[in-house]
């Protein structure tokens, strides 16, 4: 354990599942709850992922004020790089992304802005794996989305593992500035217009 800095000793693994609406703001409220209760939940689920469990389920309502407060603390206390990594990794399709992000944030708030550089740490490495997966998939879809014309509009259907439409937007808006186009993400049931 040499070289490891202990994280908040009050922090404990809790036998509870957080249930939230699946939005980024809702996730930030899960982060708020985790810090307020000094706990790492057993799991974090959305209604789409909810399943039978022996653990109690704690409903985490989305509160815009709490979400803003948590998000503002990322840049102020952890730096722009951490803010970017957490925001981007939230788009990951990984089932346990919320729990991984919460674990990382507890570590980062305990150790400070340099935590994001500790890529070999077991609570940091998964974030870089998610980022790598997102980057690879964005690059793949930027090069391989095939559009078909339908009534003067270009349309395409994609099936990504990650929720990458927000990351594809700048590329395709720049590529087709004067075109009407639509990309439908069939996996996440979302549309980029």
Model-assigned labels for residue ranges:
Residues 5-7, 16-17, 31, 44, ...:
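Extended aliphatic helical segments
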Residues 114-193:
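Internal, well-folded beta-alpha domain core
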Residues 18-20, 55, 84, 128, ...:
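Sequence-level detector for tyrosine residue identity
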Residues 45-140:
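Charged, alpha-helical interface segments at or near domain boundaries
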Residues 26-37, 103-110, 170-174:
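Short, hydrophobic/amphipathic alpha-helical patches that form generic packing surfaces
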Residues 2-63:
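N-terminal ordered "arm"
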Residues 15-17, 101, 178:
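Generic intrinsically disordered, low-complexity segments enriched for polar/acidic and small residues
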């Amino acid at each position: 354990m040499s070289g490891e800095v202990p994280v908040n000793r009050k922090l404990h693994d809790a036998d509870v599942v957080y249930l939230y609406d699946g939005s980024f703001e809702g996730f930030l409220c899960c982060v708020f709850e985790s810090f307020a209760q000094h706990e790492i939940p057993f799991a974090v689920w959305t209604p789409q992922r909810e399943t039978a469990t022996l653990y109690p389920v704690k409903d985490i309502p989305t509160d815009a004020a709490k979400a803003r407060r948590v998000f503002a603390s990322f840049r102020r206390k952890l730096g722009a790089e951490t803010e970017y990594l957490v925001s981007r990794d939230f788009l990951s399709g990984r089932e346990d992304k919320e729990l991984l992000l919460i674990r990382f944030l507890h570590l980062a708030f305990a150790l400070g802005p340099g935590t994001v550089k500790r890529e070999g740490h077991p609570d940091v490495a998964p974030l870089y794996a998610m980022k790598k997966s997102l980057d690879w998939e964005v690059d793949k879809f930027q090069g391989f989305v095939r559009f078909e014309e339908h009534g003067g509009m270009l349309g395409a259907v994609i099936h990504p593992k990650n929720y990458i439409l927000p990351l594809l937007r700048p590329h395709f808006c720049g590529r087709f500035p004067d075109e009407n186009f639509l990309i439908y993400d069939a996996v996440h049931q979302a549309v980029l217009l």
